[in-house]
Every structure is written in C-alpha cells, then in structure tokens.
Swiss-Prot record:
Localization in the cell: Nucleus
Protein name, per record: Homeobox protein Hox-C9
SUPFAM superfamilies: Homeodomain-like
Gene: HOXC9
Protein source organism: Homo sapiens (Human)
Main location: nucleus
Subunit (UniProt): Interacts with Geminin/GMNN, which inhibits transcriptional activity.
InterPro entries hit by this protein: Abd-B_homeobox_TF, HD, HD_metazoa, Homeobox_CS, Homeodomain-like_sf, Hox9_activation_N, HXA9/HXB9/HXC9
Keywords: Developmental protein, DNA-binding, Homeobox, Nucleus, Phosphoprotein, Transcription, Transcription regulation
Entry function: Sequence-specific transcription factor which is part of a developmental regulatory system that provides cells with specific positional identities on the anterior-posterior axis.
UniProt DNA-binding region: 192-251
Biological process (GO), any one: regulation of transcription by RNA polymerase II
Pfam families: Homeodomain, Hox9_act
Length: 260
C-alpha cells in the first residue's frame, strides 16, 4: 500500500502507537487537515543577544545583464508547411529553380509566396531571334504537363568540346588495335594506294591532243607538257600508259568483231 499524499490517519494508527503522538507532533509539521501544533520554546534558541550581521555586496562577475537570445529571423529558415492540394492538370516545374522578384505569378500558390522559374539557357546568344526585348519573357521559361515533357525529344547542341572528345575517342580506339591480331588488322585495314586525283576537262583535252600527234613522249616533251598543264611528269607518263592500254584494248575488240 502506497500513499502519494500526506500520511493518512489510518496508516499512521496502524503502524505506531498513540503514546508517541507528542514526539511525532514535535518532529513533523501538521498538515492542512490538522491544526498546527505549537513548538516548545526550548527547541528554538534565543538569538536576541547577538548583533545582526551585514555583508558587503560583491561585484557582479558579468557586467552585462543576462538577456534571452533573440529568435532567428524567418528569412533565414523557413519551416516546411503543408502545400495546398493541386489538381491533376496543374502545371509543374523542374527542380533546379531560382527565385525571381515577382517575374511570374501562379494562381495556385498564395499571394505572399515566392515565385520561381527555370534557369536561363546556357547559350543566351542562340535566342537572339526570339524577340526584340533583352529581358526575360514567357518563351524563356518552360512549362508543361508531365506527358508533354516526356514526349518531347531532347535537343542536343553541337559544341567544339564534344567534337574534340569524339575525335580523341576515335584515336584511342585506333591505338588499342593489336598489330599481332590479324582479324583486327583485316577489319580496319586501309589501302596503301594514294588518293585518286582526276584530271580536269582541260587537262584531259590537251593530253588527248598530244596523244593524237604522238603516242610516245620524249623526256623533254613530257616535261614541257607537265609544266603547261600544271601536272607532274609521273602523272603525264601514267596517263599516256593508260591511254595506250585503252587503245590496244579497243583495237583488239575491233579485230575480234571483224573476224566473227
């Protein structure tokens, strides 16, 4: 049995005898239920003979008074509050937002709320033809439903950094080829033949005229023709060789037709 309040009469009577009531009354003060018992004068000494003591006040350790710390302004920290429920057809924005000084307002948000908009494009010069104004306008911001943004194809702008990166990757792939691997060499093999340099119509016409006069050229004449046509001696020599082979083939076909 436990009692949270003052000791009840029943609990005291069951534990102690009535012979010690005077002793208990002098030790325990009376509660509101019982009248206050007067303490005997012998227990309290008389201090009227001693003079009263007076102490000099000590200087305060801290000169300034203790004041509560001022609360932080609401500008620094904004506690999260429940936002109003938006409908299914309400427009939404991306997560990388920046605050604007009232540039665009939304009817779904409270009047005192902060307005947000998407960051501007990283290439502002490409939007020079959008409008005459230099400030931000509604075409500069992108709004749309999730379905519209999902269906919209991403636009990639070519940049010199991307081209340089692609070229470096291509070079690394070439360097990774093993020269001892015949399969890789066969796949990436290139012809050692020089790039074909076709003759112009004027050069071909002059060479044909020279071929009609003489099927074989001397070294001096070949040098002169090459200088006039802005060609090398080797190019003139090869052209005459090919032209003689072509003429020989044409004569052989003509002879075969006559015999048949």
């Amino acid at each position: 049995m436990s009692a949270t309040g003052p000791i009840s009469n029943y609990y005291v009577d069951s534990l102690i005898s009535h012979d010690n009531e005077d002793l208990l009354a002098s030790r325990f003060p009376a509660t509101g239920a019982h009248p206050a018992a007067a303490r005997p004068s012998g227990l309290v000494p008389d201090c009227s003979d001693f003079p009263s003591c007076s102490f000099a006040p000590k200087p305060a350790v801290f000169s300034t008074s203790w004041a509560p710390v001022p609360s932080q302004s609401s500008v620094v920290y904004h506690p999260y509050g429940p936002q109003p429920h938006l409908g299914a057809d309400t427009r939404y924005m991306r997560t990388w937002l920046e605050p604007l000084s009232g540039a665009v307002s939304f009817p779904s948000f409270p009047a005192g709320g902060r307005h947000y908009a998407l960051k501007p494009d990283a290439y502002p010069g490409r939007r020079a033809d959008c409008g005459p104004g230099e400030g931000r306008s509604y075409p500069d911001y992108m709004y749309g439903s999730p379905g519209e943004l999902r269906d919209r194809a991403p636009q990639t702008l070519p940049s010199p950094e991307a081209d340089a990166l692609a070229g470096s990757k291509h070079k690394e792939e070439k360097a990774d080829l093993d020269p001892s691997n015949p399969v890789a060499n066969w796949i990436h093999a290139r012809s050692t033949r020089k790039k074909r340099c076709p003759y112009t119509k004027y050069q071909t016409l002059e060479l044909e005229k020279e071929f009609l006069f003489n099927m074989y050229l001397t070294r001096d004449r070949r040098y002169e023709v090459a200088r006039v046509l802005n060609l090398t001696e080797r190019q003139v020599k090869i052209w005459f060789q090919n032209r003689r082979m072509k003429m020989k083939k044409m004569n052989k076909e003509k002879t075969d037709k006559e015999q048949s």
